[in-house]
């Protein structure tokens, strides 16, 4: 073709002699000439013209001629070129032409056209081209499937026809073959083994096959012998199946007629050739019995046999190679195989015809490359297989061995460049070995490096270059209005101050219920509530006075000691404190039940003895101070901090007159005249019966005798067990382990409410509300739980829980829980526990315990202890007398008898097991059970 542009019309005119009116090629010669022109075509126009001519050609002969001449290969070249140049129109035209050509499997195997088309169907960018390629691929797949299935079937049919002809023509040869079979009996044994394998799958049919083969083999053998004369006889000798079968038939030859009768009905179904076989079969009467049964059952199990044949395929395959080896030499072995095939046909009669599969199976294996050779090899193997096979229209599986030259098959796979590949996937063993070596090396290096790694810097630190960043164009929050709103809000709102880490707010008021809670002996710090047990007792009874008992019975000392040791809070003194405690107790009191505690208390040197024995062990903290009371501050053991360490009492004489006589209750010198007594009571006189409670101190200060106390000259009660607070007070004077937690100040919002630790707020805004210990605030509200206190500053209220106190300055109220108190200044009110009374000070009034709380910043929470007696103010406002002892004034105050779980008659409760066994109880005064002689009368 010229290098200039091509006019398709001129090209068609030049080809007019080869084309008809529709553009179709007229003859086979014309297509060969057109093919020669196509090879010279270089322009796309000419190529498209030739492709359109092929599309118009309908004659399959002409198209096949084009393929044979080399047109298919030429189209492959064009397809490859157009694919590389991505010429979509030309690709579409080529694909249409390929779809139009009658290609076969052999053609597709010649080159990689099919692979190129498949790649186009997957990776082409043009959707139409992809669809066209996928359609072409599906068409070719259908061709491959159809040819692979149809070709073997056609070959089988041809073989069957040939076998039938050979069977019908030579009936006499079987006798000669029988002789040959008698010569070689060993071969028949081998054959029998084959049927046995078949029997494994279908025993009844196996019998039928064996019988049918034996009878039919002679007829079949002669037929094939006619075709293959002497060679056939030799090969038949190799196949002694008929010999054995005939020998077997000879033994039962007497019963031949019945066998014939039985076989005739079977023969009626087969063709005339099968009838001939039936006549030959009669010599097998003995086997016929089982054979007839097999035949009768055969038609029904025929379908089942198909399944069984599938199973048999492996077993049958094993014998087939055996025969194949024997008969592989000449293709004439086919006659032997066809002869046995007729017996198999008899079996086929029972089992609706299964195609002779020996040939088909090899074709399946060889369809790709060994079709002609496979046919030859198949007949060789078929002799054994056909006998075992049935004609049911199904392929028979078998094993064949192709010739030496055809043993190798090559399959070519082209990599689709666009296909995604797993890069990490190991492709071959060599790569896997390399990877393993690298991984081992890496693991070894890391292990070695880690073993000697001292975590030291090996590379000197180099300060990185500072990055110069441009200033931000927009300042964050520059236009925010919310920040101004927040600033205005903060101007009018107090800052939230969290003085205690545990809780930022005041604790909620805890309502006290008369129901005693359950004892859960956890850590000593948080084992008990403020008012764990409440009991109502008679006020009289020296031994039964609850508070007096709680503070005057000896076992409370033991309770203090044991409490300081319990729950992992041993004394801070020597390690052997526990043993010393036991020795001290035994030396002092012997048995708690042997001597009444009051007798011990009356001993003049009893308190000194206790002090001398306890202080060296650190059980009472440091030695006595000015007034003989050890401070309960942080220096002492945690469990002993029930004496506030705050400043001295602001008012002279709240705890005893400065010049008054001091009875043996005090363990040291009298308190200094002003503020020298920062504690309510000393260790031997913790809460009830100090000079301020029961001491006869005649000084100007008021005194208050403890409930149930004896009087100023009576021996002091032992100290009660300390409360172990869980939280420290808020104001400066509070103990770290006060129990009361944070509290609001009476005056300025700061509150000190330790459970038992002392604390005196000297400042104006601190309230002191210790649970048991005293404290005095200069300008503060003092709310000790049990002990008295006095407030000097204005606006301070003294609200001891149980003990008395006097508010000296104006505006102070005295609200003892059960003890009396007088408001000395204006606005001071005395609100004792229960009974009415008149306050000597102005606007002071008595308010019973159980009434509503006192108004103001802090309400008074009643103790809920029943049995409180009212107060009578007979003497001066600051003089209150207990119900038993004489008072300075003319008035007596009768304290309540139900202790704050430090007294109380528990005799109606079960006796404490620990107390009876050990002589002490870790919960001494807080124990819910009866301690004889401590929280109730001693046992009789």
From Swiss-Prot:
It is found in: Nucleus; Chromosome. Residues 393-408 are annotated as: Necessary for interaction with PPP1CC. Residues 73-147 form the TFIIS N-terminal domain. GO terms for molecular function: DNA binding; enzyme-substrate adaptor activity; protein phosphatase 1 binding; protein phosphatase inhibitor activity; protein phosphatase regulator activity; RNA binding; zinc ion binding. CDD domains: TFIIS_I. Residues 153-166, 174-196, 596-611, 862-886, 894-903 have a biased composition (Basic and acidic residues). SMART domains: TFS2N, ZnF_C3H1. The modification Phosphothreonine is found at residue 256. Residues 418-619 are annotated as: Interaction with WDR82. Phosphorylated on Ser-398 by PKA within the region necessary for interaction with PPP1CA. Substrate-recognition component of the PNUTS-PP1 protein phosphatase complex, a protein phosphatase 1 (PP1) complex that promotes RNA polymerase II transcription pause-release, allowing transcription elongation. Promoter-proximal pausing by RNA polymerase II is a transcription halt following transcription initiation but prior to elongation, which acts as a checkpoint to control that transcripts are favorably configured for transcriptional elongation. PANTHER family: SERINE/THREONINE-PROTEIN PHOSPHATASE 1 REGULATORY SUBUNIT 10-RELATED, SERINE_THREONINE-PROTEIN PHOSPHATASE 1 REGULATORY SUBUNIT 10. This is Serine/threonine-protein phosphatase 1 regulatory subunit 10. It comes from Macaca mulatta (Rhesus macaque). The lineage of its organism: Eukaryota, Metazoa, Chordata, Craniata, Vertebrata. The gene is PPP1R10.
């Amino acid at each position: 073709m010229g290098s200039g542009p091509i006019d398709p019309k001129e090209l068609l005119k030049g080809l007019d002699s080869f084309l008809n009116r529709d553009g179709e090629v007229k003859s086979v010669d014309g297509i060969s000439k057109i093919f020669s022109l196509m090879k010279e075509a270089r322009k796309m126009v000419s190529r498209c013209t030739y492709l359109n001519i092929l599309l118009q050609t309908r004659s399959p002969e002409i198209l096949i001629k084009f393929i044979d001449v080399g047109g298919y290969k030429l189209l492959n070249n064009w397809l490859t070129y157009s694919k590389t140049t991505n010429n979509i129109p030309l690709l579409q035209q080529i694909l249409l032409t390929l779809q139009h050509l009658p290609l076969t499997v052999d053609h597709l195997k010649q080159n990689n056209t099919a692979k190129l088309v498949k790649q186009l169907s997957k990776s082409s960018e043009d959707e139409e081209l992809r669809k066209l390629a996928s359609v072409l691929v599906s068409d070719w797949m259908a061709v491959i499937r159809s040819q692979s299935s149809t070709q073997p079937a056609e070959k089988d049919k041809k073989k069957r026809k040939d076998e039938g002809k050979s069977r019908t023509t030579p009936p006499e040869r079987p006798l000669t073959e029988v002789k040959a079979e008698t010569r070689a009996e060993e071969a028949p044994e081998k054959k029998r083994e084959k049927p046995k394998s078949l029997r494994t799958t279908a025993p009844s049919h196996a019998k039928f096959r064996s019988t049918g083969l034996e009878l039919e083999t002679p007829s079949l053998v002669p037929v094939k012998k006619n075709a293959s004369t002497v060679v056939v006889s030799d090969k038949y000798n190799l196949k002694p199946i008929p010999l054995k079968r005939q020998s077997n038939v000879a033994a039962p030859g007497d019963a031949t007629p019945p066998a014939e009768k039985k076989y005739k009905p079977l023969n009626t179904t087969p063709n005339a050739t099968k009838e001939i076989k039936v006549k030959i079969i009669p010599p097998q009467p003995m086997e016929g019995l089982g054979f007839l049964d097999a035949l009768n059952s055969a038609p029904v199990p025929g379908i089942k046999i198909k399944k069984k044949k599938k199973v048999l395929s492996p077993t049958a395959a094993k014998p087939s190679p055996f025969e194949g080896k024997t008969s592989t030499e000449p293709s004439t072995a086919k006659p032997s195989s066809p002869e046995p095939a007729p017996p198999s046909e008899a079996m086929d009669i029972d089992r609706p015809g299964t195609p002779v599969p020996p040939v088909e199976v090899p074709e399946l294996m060889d369809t790709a490359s060994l079709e002609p050779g496979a046919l030859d090899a198949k007949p060789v193997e078929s002799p054994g297989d056909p006998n075992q096979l049935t004609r049911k229209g199904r392929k028979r599986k078998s094993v064949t061995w192709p010739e030496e030259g055809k043993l190798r098959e090559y399959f070519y796979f082209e990599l689709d460049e666009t296909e995604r590949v797993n890069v990490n996937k190991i492709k071959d063993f060599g790569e896997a070995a390399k990877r393993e070596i690298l991984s081992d090396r890496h693991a070894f290096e890391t292990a070695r490096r880690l073993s000697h790694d001292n975590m030291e810097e090996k590379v000197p630190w180099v300060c990185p270059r500072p990055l110069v960043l441009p200033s931000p164009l927009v300042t964050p929050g520059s236009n925010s209005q919310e920040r101004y709103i927040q600033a205005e809000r903060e101007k009018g709102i107090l800052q939230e101050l969290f003085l205690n880490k545990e809780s930022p707010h005041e604790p909620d008021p805890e309502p006290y219920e008369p129901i005693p809670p359950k004892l859960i002996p956890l850590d000593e710090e948080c084992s008990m509530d403020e008012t764990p047990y409440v009991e109502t007792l008679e006020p009289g009874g020296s031994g039964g006075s609850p508070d007096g008992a709680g503070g005057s019975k000896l076992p409370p000392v033991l309770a203090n000691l044991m409490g300081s040791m319990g729950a992992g809070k041993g004394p801070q003194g020597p390690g052997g404190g526990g043993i010393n405690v036991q020795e001290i107790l035994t030396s002092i009191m012997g048995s708690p039940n042997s001597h009444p505690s009051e007798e011990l208390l009356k001993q003049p040197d009893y308190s000194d003895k206790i002090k001398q024995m306890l202080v060296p062990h650190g059980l009472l903290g440091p030695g006595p101070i000015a007034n003989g009371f050890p401070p309960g501050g942080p220096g002492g053991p945690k469990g002993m901090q029930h004496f506030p360490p705050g400043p001295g009492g602001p008012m002279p004489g709240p705890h005893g007159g400065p010049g008054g006589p001091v009875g043996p209750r005090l363990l040291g010198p009298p308190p200094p005249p002003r503020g020298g007594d920062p504690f309510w009571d000393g260790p031997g006189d913790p809460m009830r019966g100090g000079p301020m409670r029961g001491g006869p101190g005649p000084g100007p200060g008021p005194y208050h005798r403890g409930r149930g106390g004896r009087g100023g000259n009576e021996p002091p009660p032992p100290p009660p067990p300390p409360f172990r607070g869980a939280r420290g007070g808020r104001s400066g004077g509070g103990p770290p382990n006060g129990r009361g937690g944070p509290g609001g100040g009476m005056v300025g919002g700061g509150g000190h409410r330790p459970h038992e630790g002392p604390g005196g707020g000297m400042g104006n805004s601190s309230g002191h509300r210790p649970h048991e210990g005293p404290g005095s605030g200069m300008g503060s509200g003092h709310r000790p739980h049990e002990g008295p206190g006095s407030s000097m500053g204005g606006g301070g209220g003294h609200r001891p829980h149980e003990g008395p106190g006097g508010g000296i300055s104006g505006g102070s109220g005295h609200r003892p829980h059960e003890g009396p108190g007088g408001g000395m200044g204006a606005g001071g009110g005395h609100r004792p526990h229960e009974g009415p009374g008149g306050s000597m000070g102005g606007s002071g009034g008595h308010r019973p315990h159980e009434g509503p709380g006192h108004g103001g910043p802090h309400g008074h929470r009643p103790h809920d202890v029943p049995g409180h007696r009212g107060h009578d103010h007979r003497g001066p406002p600051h003089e209150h007398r207990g119900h038993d002892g004489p008072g300075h004034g003319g008035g007596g105050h009768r304290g309540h008898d139900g202790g704050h779980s430090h007294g109380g008659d528990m005799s109606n409760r079960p006796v404490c097991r620990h107390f009876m066994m050990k002589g002490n109880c870790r919960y001494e005064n807080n124990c819910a059970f009866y301690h004889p002689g401590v929280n109730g009368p001693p046992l009789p």
